[in-house]
């Protein structure tokens, strides 16, 4: 049994603790679902349990024994594994090589044991029915395969608790059903699951044994499925409304003519006005496809035309575009300060070699304008702090500021308002709308509320086909839901 007693966690940019005297025991083999509004600390709690980040106060006991210096190695030694929210596996290893390293360890100059890996994999498949081409390169896996690979990797012989942080976020309905079956199989095999979600609460009610609710820094446990939604105050009463400015912007400085293929075939043409937000909405499962396209990882036929220049391949640096990716993982390296990261991205973008004091001063001035209500001392403390010191929502805001700072042509945002607390949600909304008065923004999302809040024009797609391309003022939420079968 693992027990977390009076756990307190602070972030320097938030006045009150994100987790305030959390008490949690995990002993039974159940499917636990951790629910709460954006910014309530769900992912923070998951990382503390998995030993990835430190907590400020409290203690952890395993089978009644107090643990000193809880970290990821101690968590794994006690059978606790985390399947991350936004996995970033672009390595050249084959699947069996990755599993061999994860299951059995690896020493330099020692060959990996292929037969041992295949044998353990076949033994696992008796219970979990997850089939893989073990000789396939990891970089060639799709998002569903990557998630299931991470799950298989976590199924070491000592596995007792597996934490899934928004793991079904990019699954189709069919894939989500396969994931739920896996949770049930894990339970039958004696492995408890902690499924962390915000958007799939209604579905989670159907398969979960018990719920852990995070609200206002506190933790509640219940098996009463009827009480879940009443405990969670609806976020609709706190929705921030931005003024949508549907002026007649100057037309077509940036044109996209793209044909590409992943889940479906896409043949799409659209234009970005000189200012404003064009929002593209599509299924959750294929938003990752668009991200791969703009990262240059997906081949396409066609071109992007910016100020009369044709680009027949997508390179964010060549196009001088800002890029805010999905999720909140991988936005900043753990070991660099916010200022260092801004400088590195700026110098790479502008092809600079030597750091000048003027570059640093410009970044500081930019932050002062963006965070005008912060004292100069606090801004400097933020700039020289490492990314691990901040909450996920704050890091996402800083990443948006960074991309705004370097972008020369346009800004691409993938679901920028997801997984944010109310304050960060408001700040990000205002920042994007204000930026769109100067430069164009391409918003790509599966969230209708986010789309309608931020967009001036809307392009709706389903199964690779364009259903409509209209101005925001000419379409309602109800019509979009009907059109997209939401």
UniProtKB/Swiss-Prot annotation:
UniProt keyword terms in alphabetical order: ATP-binding, Nucleotide-binding, Repeat, Transport
PROSITE patterns: ABC_TRANSPORTER_2 (PS50893)
A Pfam family recorded for this sequence: ABC_tran
Binding residue positions for ATP: 36-43
GO molecular function, one term: ATP binding
UniProt organism field: Borreliella burgdorferi (strain ATCC 35210 / DSM 4680 / CIP 102532 / B31) (Borrelia burgdorferi)
Family to which the UniProt record says this protein belongs: Belongs to the ABC transporter superfamily.
InterPro entries according to UniProt: ABC_carbohydrate_import_ATPase, ABC_transporter-like_ATP-bd, P-loop_NTPase
Domain of life, per lineage: Bacteria
ABC transporter domain boundaries: 2-241, 249-486
Keyword Transport: yes
Protein name according to UniProt: Uncharacterized ABC transporter ATP-binding protein BB_0318
Matching PANTHER family: CARBOHYDRATE TRANSPORT ATP-BINDING PROTEIN MG119-RELATED, SUGAR ABC TRANSPORTER ATP-BINDING PROTEIN
